[in-house]
């Protein structure tokens, strides 16, 4: 109770669990900063209290206060200045930090890449960070070089490729129920799916509400059984769940639960949705359920992390005086 947090602040880079899960455990007197979009996404994902660990002092749906910033905003923490800079990642609203102390220039990349819809954000960040004294650099993609590749799995080169593959699957299956799911924090991918496919895309209602909040974009939507109505959604865009269950040609819709109710022999596109992969104990039972219904499972994955060659490009663009690898199991593979 007697701690002095006058010159203390915490920054969130983006809305993934490994960066946000324990937010509610941060002392309420410490300011918590992030980009506005990340604040929107975290609040949306924790709408029902299932995303963040609950505070022991609040109800289960509590999300602690965050201060939403615009890209380029500078926050003073004592004698330290922190600029929050937008980067491209598969969680929309991701940010890096450029930190200036009285004697040094320090850069933290957060998680970033060069193969997303907003790669120019990462390039502009690199320009801002040029010749930083210390570069704290993520290296997730170099951690798993020995992971076995899945035969016949589609391997999109970039986010645009994901949308092209979805459009192709629609064309190849004109009279077949097609559903999909993705990771909700990747709001940009959902936006591009809505824009870039031939069928009418129908999102689960909370995802449609998040798309509208972040991009001011309306989309058709449906409510899960028993879900409360959302005032921010246009009632004329609602499609009934039963209509979607019976459809074979008009809709591409986001399936988030009750996969046993999908049509036998239908097509399901798994685009970085949960369960995320074979490391998740729920993954194999999920695949088994689809197999029992003879539902074709197509995985369309596009990493939010810079590819190994792009990590080298980013380091070369920044030319840091000192490189500090983080967020990787093989830091020795990142070279300045």
Name each model-derived stretch.
Residues 39-43, 144-145, 208-213, 276-279, ...:
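Short, charged/polar "capping" segments at the starts of alpha-helices
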Residues 37, 87-90, 110-112, 139-140, ...:
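Active-site metal-binding loops of divalent metal-dependent hydrolases
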Residues 1-9, 18-188, 192:
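His/Asp/Glu-rich metal-coordinating catalytic cores
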Residues 194-199, 225-336:
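C-terminal regulatory/interaction regions
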Residues 149-262, 326:
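Hard-cation-handling environments
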Residues 12, 109, 254:
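Short hydrophobic beta-strand that contains or immediately precedes a catalytic carboxylate
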Residues 30-40, 136, 200-209, 269-272, ...:
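Short internal beta-strands
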